[in-house]
Amino acid sequence: MSEFIAENRGADAITRPNWSAVFSVAFCVACLIIVEFLPVSLLTPMAQDLGISEGVAGQSVTVTAFVAMFASLFITQTIQATDRRYVVILFAVLLTISCLLVSFANSFSLLLIGRACLGLALGGFWAMSASLTMRLVPPRTVPKALSVIFGAVSIALVIAAPLGSFLGELIGWRNVFNAAAVMGVLCIFWIIKSLPSLPGKPSHQKQNTFRLLQRPGVMAGMIAIFMSFAGQFAFFTYIRPVYMNLAGFGVDGLTLVLLSFGIASFIGTSLSSFILKRSVKLALAGAPLILAVSALVLTLCGSDKIVATGVAIIWGLTFALVPVGWSTWSTRSLADQAEKAGSIQVAVIQLANTCGAAIGGYALDNIGLTSPLMLSGTLMLLTALLVTAKVKMK
């Protein structure tokens, strides 16, 4: 990582942090995350308005993750020599266009095109977010700047689903995306005003990113990452139809459940460093095991609102360990190739999100209401077993 930081500084090293630029990047991150998860809380009205099933509507999440997967792998090589300021502005424009296309969509095809635009911005932005932040502040301030970025992610995850549910009932799902488009416009203007020129640096070295998978335990780790995130999206994408039909929650009740989920996730993220200091492997094996049990409890007793609410809180609290835990594993196990490892990890997560949402939607439409839960629980159990048996820690 130190080599990567040095590579990204060179001639454009600075001595004073550009906090306005850092906060503009953080705001852009928050907007991307919020828009990514809006369909989760708006799935039912979107499906009804477009005349499609909820399982099919859930593919709006799938296509975003699918496009983001490819963007995260190839965007940094494609735009090597391009000024990063213009690239970030482009991503903010794509975010805005995505929201407008979705809000005016009169067909499922147009909805998917809009969500694909978001995927391009999301995957591309995440692939370069760390290096971008490192070029805005002096080396001593990098940890603080990164905490601002990931703090924005945590806040966005807390408010995205409940805010979407509340506003969707108040102004309609299309106007929710119109409001998100306004946020996109604010992103564009803030970035134009605050982000300095950040020239790209063409590289003539051949990238051997996938060679990292040949290292001992790395392939097992990536498979475990895939299964844990696929299990998450198989459940979370369809939390609205499951909770409204299985537990009988209304829109107001669902909003409170989603808010509880988000707050629990924020608390879990805050506690994750304390837990991971004790044992990374225990956290990575224990968290999916708890989630597997939670999925079973919700399948068997989900008609009870108290049980369903409790499962949502436990799920948010526990799954928060997963992304932080795997990032810790990656930086420890592949410290000499942290950027390449991060690129693969982002791609694996987006592929998992794609498959989890797609298969969960198919199961919901063709097998039954609790089938996404059973799929999620099975994947989480397999993750726990794989981590215990095959994943190596340093």
From Swiss-Prot:
It is found in: Cell inner membrane. The keyword Protease does not apply. It comes from the Bacteria. InterPro entries: MFS, MFS_dom, MFS_Efflux_Transporters, MFS_NepI, MFS_trans_sf. Residues 1-21, 76-85, 129-147, 197-215, 277-281, 327-343, 388-394 are cytoplasmic. It is a multi-pass membrane protein. It holds the Pfam family MFS_1. SUPFAM superfamilies: MFS general substrate transporter. PROSITE patterns: MFS. HAMAP family: MFS_NepI. Involved in the efflux of purine ribonucleosides, such as inosine and guanosine. This is Purine ribonucleoside efflux pump NepI. The gene is nepI.
